[in-house]
Amino acid sequence: MIKTIKADLENKIQKTIKELALSSNIKLDKINIVMQKPPKSEMGDLSILIFEFSKILKLSIPVITQEIIKQIGNEYKTKSMGPYLNIKFNRKEYIQNTIKKVNKEKENYGANNSLQNKKTIIEFSSPNTNKPLHVGHLRNDIIGESLSRILKASGSKVTKINLINDRGTHICKSMLAYKKFGNNITPEIAQKKGDHLIGDFYVKYNEYASQNSEIAENEIQQLLYQWEQGDEKTVQLWTKLNKWAIDGIKETYNTTNITFDKIYLESEIFKIGREVVINGLKEGLCYKREDGAICINIPTETNNIDNQNFKQKVLLRANGTSIYLTQDLGNIVARKNEFDFDEMIYVVGSEQIHHFKTLFYVADKLGITNENNLIHLSYGMVNLPEGKMKSREGNIIDADNLIHDLSQSTMLELKKRYENEQNLQKLALNISLGAIHYYLLKTAIHKDILFNKTESLSFTGNSGPYIQYVGARINSILDKYNNLNLPNKNTNFDLLINENEWEIIKIISEFEEYIIKASKDRNPSIIANYSYLLAKNFSTYYQDTKIIDKDNLELTHARIDLAKAVLQTIKNCMHLLNIPYIQKM
């Protein structure tokens, strides 16, 4: 609704400014129209900045304002205030159109075509098979999943990809520890998920290496060499441990409702990059050093490609082995061939900024794709109160245990409320997932997070359980209304004159704009904070207003339609944020 009004006003203002420019013989390259919310609601619903037009057209603000008002006509109430023209909407029409639109479009409300047919790949999660997922992975996963849903809501054709890192020295560390200390233990014998069992051996390796560093390093290199040569026993061990780890990781994905369209294993595709570099050498895009290594020159600061100071970057070592950047080049080629993407987004922590700047520059120079088609969506770290997590020391909050801990805390609270209620375990899990997902999304993604379990589970603050609770409360209101079995009547939206009702309507009507902004900025926190704003406003309204009034059924019908629109919008937010909707709490 608000988007339609803004587009209508923009067209009328554009027409007015062009006519004024033409009459003054002024050539305009671009007309930038600034619309914003007034600081106070009584000033209007939208403010248009006129001052810039005055400078360009060399006309007074009142003259320009009057011409715009003529063009707008009687459709909106207008009032000039200094450099601004304030607009007031027709409330009755606006309320009716907004509620009808939401309740008609339902789960599609908010969807738009701002990214229509744009082919986007999002690579996220990308775990190593030497440990379970921890809360840092959860932030990566929920950003990737949520952003995928937001981009889809804006019309993009999204492909979600997961590249599982299942080879290399870090994987060999768990393998070596298992060979030394495993005693043929299995997840079944240990009564542990496979990824947790493998993670234990990763920690054991680091304990062993701290006492035998040189020996351990030599053993790791020997094990890696044996794997690369296809040694049967080594490959069998690698296959067994990787399967345990991947099966365990997939269980966590299933619990957290994280899905992928395609899962790659690094071991299956890492050689593609070598071919890309050799082809680049043949085409003269890179060069061979005296020792046989194949290199390319990159700017010393890859965020400034005009910098003329270059340094050498090895793409293939003298012995023919590749580096991670080379493997990533191969992945870009493979995905370009398979999906012909318009853009590829990598959801990876901020510590990898330099790697991706270099990767994108080299991909461009080798003619693989324009570096502007490649995006590193950098996110901040998730820290414990004690500091940064380190999996090699076992100092992590692993995802499964975090979910379990929060579920147990929630169960204790639920048992106080529902002594005889069934399925409390499922309810506790869904509340816990809402708590975790919301907490990891509500902060702007580039910022670090200090994870606070108690705060994440709060039912009263800016939290996932609060959003879930407001949704459940509205559902309860609707159930109570439906049980009255009142006759169906046309809703009289003219009765919704409460200022709180108007504020809620305006928030609902802006949902599409929030999705567009979240898509453009690639920032799910915009939707998270929007959902809290809507939930908080409805909660205030509910406390101050009698929604079901048996003595005024006409008003009740109108307020119930409003409540339905709020619930649908909250449910749509929850879907975008991968937060479970709960009917009863």
UniProtKB/Swiss-Prot annotation:
Class of this enzyme: ligase
GO CC annotation terms, alphabetical: cytoplasm
Keyword Ligase annotated: yes
UniProt catalytic activity: tRNA(Arg) + L-arginine + ATP = L-arginyl-tRNA(Arg) + AMP + diphosphate
Annotated keywords: Aminoacyl-tRNA synthetase, ATP-binding, Cytoplasm, Ligase, Nucleotide-binding, Protein biosynthesis
Complex and partners: Monomer.
Protein name (record): Arginine--tRNA ligase
Record lineage: Bacteria, Pseudomonadati, Spirochaetota, Spirochaetia, Spirochaetales
